[in-house]
UniProtKB/Swiss-Prot annotation:
Further facts: CTPSs have evolved a hybrid strategy for distinguishing between UTP and CTP. The overlapping regions of the product feedback inhibitory and substrate sites recognize a common feature in both compounds, the triphosphate moiety. To differentiate isosteric substrate and product pyrimidine rings, an additional pocket far from the expected kinase/ligase catalytic site, specifically recognizes the cytosine and ribose portions of the product inhibitor.
Family classification: Belongs to the CTP synthase family.
Activity control, per UniProt: Allosterically activated by GTP, when glutamine is the substrate; GTP has no effect on the reaction when ammonia is the substrate. The allosteric effector GTP functions by stabilizing the protein conformation that binds the tetrahedral intermediate(s) formed during glutamine hydrolysis. Inhibited by the product CTP, via allosteric rather than competitive inhibition.
Disulfide bonds: none
Residue positions binding Mg(2+): 71, 141
Name by which UniProt lists this protein: CTP synthase
Binding residues for ATP: 14-19, 71
InterPro entries (UniProt xref): Class_I_gatase-like (IPR029062), CTP_synthase (IPR004468), CTP_synthase_N (IPR017456), GATASE (IPR017926), GATase1_CTP_Synthase (IPR033828), P-loop_NTPase (IPR027417)
Swiss-Prot/TrEMBL keywords: ATP-binding, Glutamine amidotransferase, Ligase, Magnesium, Metal-binding, Nucleotide-binding, Pyrimidine biosynthesis
Enzyme Commission code: 6.3.4.2
Annotated positions binding CTP: 13, 148-150, 188-193, 224
Ranges for domain Glutamine amidotransferase type-1: 292-534
Domain of life: Bacteria
C-alpha cells in the first residue's frame, strides 16, 4: 500500500516547505524506499511557463516536457529522481481539466462543484503520482499558507485522502515560522498555535510540526507546541537556518524525523545510510579554492530566476574541488566600452537562457569578449543562439545578423522559428519541451565532456533554432556544430575548438545536475575556468 505524506505551511510563505519535503524524500530514499514527490500550486495559471521570473523564479522542465515550479528542481536534486507531469498541479490545470470534461458531457448532467469534482480531480493527481512511478511513498507539498482562500480545495482533498486510504497510510506535516522577538528576548509560539488551529478547523490534524527558526528552540518550546497543537513532543522538529541547504536532511535525521514518519506510517525500513551525503556536505563546507564565474543575465536581481544554473555550477565546483563565486552581471548594463573592465576578473563566463529583446546586446558583448580573449564560456539556450549571432556579426561580417524572434526584419535570420512552431498562437505549453536526444561529434569538446558518448538526452525549452541555411558559412570559418538532433535538422551544441572552452548548447544541461553527480558539460566548463584562473 502506498503511503502519502502531505506538507503544508503556515504563518508565512517561502518558509522552506520545499526543502523540508525534499530532505524527507532523501532520507526515505536512503532507507531503501521508492519515493516520488509533487507540488500543488494554488494559483490559477495552468503552469508557470508564461509567468515572469520576477514573479515566480525559474521555470523548471521535466523529462516529459512539463513546465513546473522551481521546487521540482529541489526535489530532483535532493532525491536524485526524475519527476513527471503529475508532479506539479495548479488550480488552473485542475479547473481546465474539469471544465473540459463537463463540456464533453462526462459528468452526465451533474452539477459540477468544488466537492466532489475538483477535490476528486486533485486526489486523482495524488494517486497517479504513485501509480505512474510505482512508489512506496508520495510526498505532496501544498504551496502558500493555510488560510489562503486559494488553498481550500487542495486542503479539502488532503483531508479526504485519510478516509480514502486509511489513517495508517497518511501523514500530515505542518511547517511554520517560530519568530524571535529581540526586544522581548523570547520565541513566540502563538502564530504556530493559530496556524494549527486554522488547519484543524479544516479537518486536518497535523502529525508533525516543522518549525523554522534562526536559533534552537529548546525542549520547553517544543513541549509547549506539542501540548497546544496536539502532537507528540518528539514530532516537533526544528528547521534551523544553515550555511548550506544540503545540511537540512542531516539535521532532520539527527532529530529522528524519518524514524517518526516510518513509525507513524508503519513502514518497516532500515535506517538511512547518509554516509555519502554527509561526506558531500562536509566537502561543500570545506572547499579551499574559489573560482569566479560571471553570470550574464537579464533577471540577475532575482537569483531564483537562475536557480538550476547556480546549483549546477556549485555541483561542478564540488566535482572540481572549488567553491564557485558568482558575479551577477546585468546584461542591460554591458556595452562595448565597459565589457572588458566589467568581466576582467572572471575565470569563466556563463550566458544562460531567457526570452525577449532586453539584455541581448549586452549578452552578445559578453560572448564576444569571451571569444576574443579566450575566456571559458558556456552558453545555454538563448545563450547558444546569441553565440551564433555574435559569430555571424563579428567573424562572418553579416551586419545586422539576428534572431527572427528579436528582429523579424533582419536580413540575416541566423536564428529562426522552428517549422512546427510557425502556426502556433498560444504562448503557454507550446514550446519544444522536455527530453530529446543529441548526437555528439566525435573528437569535439562536447563529446569529451560526456565521456565520448555518441548520444546524450537532455531537456529543452525553446521555440527558435539555428537556421541551417547558414551552416556552411559558419563551418567554413571553423565554427563546429558538435551536437545535432539524430535527423541532423536541429543544431544542439556549437563550439570553437581552438579556444580553451567556448561551447554553447540549445538544451538546458542544468536540469540534469545533481550534488553527487555534476552535469558533464557544466563540469567541463568549470574545469576550464579553474585552469584559466591559474
Amino acid at each position: 500500500m502506498t503511503k502519502y505524506i502531505f506538507v503544508t505551511g503556515g504563518v508565512v510563505s517561502s518558509i522552506g516547505k520545499g526543502i523540508v519535503a525534499a530532505s524527507l524524500g532523501r532520507l526515505l530514499k536512503n532507507r531503501g524506499l521508492k519515493v516520488t514527490i509533487q507540488k500543488f500550486d494554488p494559483y490559477i495559471n495552468i503552469d508557470p511557463g508564461t509567468m515572469s521570473p520576477y514573479q515566480h523564479g525559474e521555470v523548471y522542465v521535466t523529462d516529459d516536457g512539463v513546465e513546473t515550479d522551481l521546487d521540482l528542481g529541489h526535489y530532483e536534486r535532493f532525491i536524485d529522481i526524475n519527476l513527471n507531469k503529475y508532479s506539479n498541479v495548479t488550480t488552473g490545470k485542475i479547473y481546465s481539466e474539469v471544465l473540459r470534461k463537463e463540456r464533453k458531457g462526462e459528468y452526465l448532467g451533474a452539477t459540477v462543484q468544488v466537492i466532489p469534482h475538483i477535490t476528486d480531480a486533485l486526489k486523482d493527481k495524488i494517486k497517479r503520482a504513485a501509480t505512474t512511478t510505482d512508489s512506496d511513498v508520495v510526498i505532496t507539498e501544498v504551496g502558500g499558507t493555510v488560510g489562503d482562500i486559494e488553498s481550500l480545495p487542495f486542503l479539502e482533498a488532503l483531508r479526504q485522502m485519510k478516509a480514502d486510504v486509511g489513517s495508517d497510510n497518511v501523514m500530515y506535516i505542518h511547517t511554520t515560522l517560530l519568530p524571535y522577538l529581540k526586544a522581548a528576548g523570547e520565541m513566540k509560539t502563538k502564530p504556530t498555535q493559530h496556524s494549527v488551529k486554522e488547519l484543524r478547523g479544516l479537518g486536518i490534524q497535523p502529525n508533525m510540526l516543522v518549525i523554522r527558526t534562526e536559533e534552537p528552540a529548546g525542549q520547553g518550546i517544543k513541549n509547549k507546541l506539542a501540548q497546544f497543537c496536539d502532537v507528540a513532543p518528539e514530532a516537533v522538529i526544528e528547521s534551523l537556518d544553515v550555511e548550506h541547504i544540503y545540511q537540512v536532511p542531516l539535521n532532520m535525521q539527527a532529530q529522528g524525523m524519518d524514524q517518526i514518519v516510518c513509525d507513524h506510517l508503519k513502514l518497516n525500513a532500515p535506517a538511512a545510510d547518509m554516509t555519502e551525503w554527509s561526506a558531500m556536505v562536509d566537502k561543500v563546507l570545506n572547499l579551499k579554492k574559489t573560482t569566479k564565474i560571471a553570470l550574464v543575465g537579464k533577471y540577475v536581481e532575482l537569483h531564483d530566476a537562475y536557480l538550476s544554473v547556480v546549483e549546477a555550477l556549485k555541483h561542478s565546483g564540488l566535482a572540481n574541488d572549488t567553491a564557485i563565486d558568482i558575479d551577477w552581471v546585468n546584461a542591460n548594463d554591458l556595452t562595448a566600452e565597459n565589457v572588458a573592465s566589467r568581466l576582467a576578473d572572471a575565470d569563466g563566463i556563463i550566458v544562460p537562457g531567457g526570452f525577449g529583446q532586453r539584455g541581448t546586446e549586452g549578452k552578445i558583448q559578453a560572448i564576444r569578449y569571451a571569444r576574443e580573449n579566450d575566456v571559458p564560456m558556456l552558453g545555454v539556450c538563448l545563450g547558444m543562439q546569441l553565440t551564433c549571432i555574435e559569430f555571424a556579426r563579428h567573424v562572418l561580417h553579416l551586419d545586422g545578423a539576428n534572431s527572427a524572434e528579436l528582429d523579424p526584419e533582419t536580413q540575416y535570420p541566423i536564428i529562426d522559428i522552428m517549422r512546427d512552431q510557425i502556426d502556433i498562437e498560444d504562448m503557454g505549453g507550446t514550446l519544444r519541451l522536455g527530453l530529446y536526444p543529441c548526437k555528439l561529434k566525435p573528437g569535439s569538446k562536447a563529446a569529451a565532456a560526456y565521456g565520448n558518448q555518441e548520444v546524450v538526452q537532455r531537456r529543452h525549452r525553446h521555440r527558435y533554432e539555428f537556421n541551417t541555411k547558414f551552416r556552411e558559412q559558419f563551418e567554413a570559418e571553423g565554427f563546429v556544430f558538435s551536437g545535432v538532433s539524430p535527423d541532423n535538422r536541429l543544431m544542439e551544441v556549437v563550439e570553437l575548438p581552438d579556444k580553451k572552452f567556448f561551447v554553447a548548447a540549445q538544451y538546458h544541461p542544468e536540469y540534469h545536475s545533481r550534488p553527487n553527480h555534476a552535469e558533464e558539460l557544466y563540469s567541463a566548463f568549470v574545469t576550464a575556468a579553474v585552469e584559466n584562473a591559474k
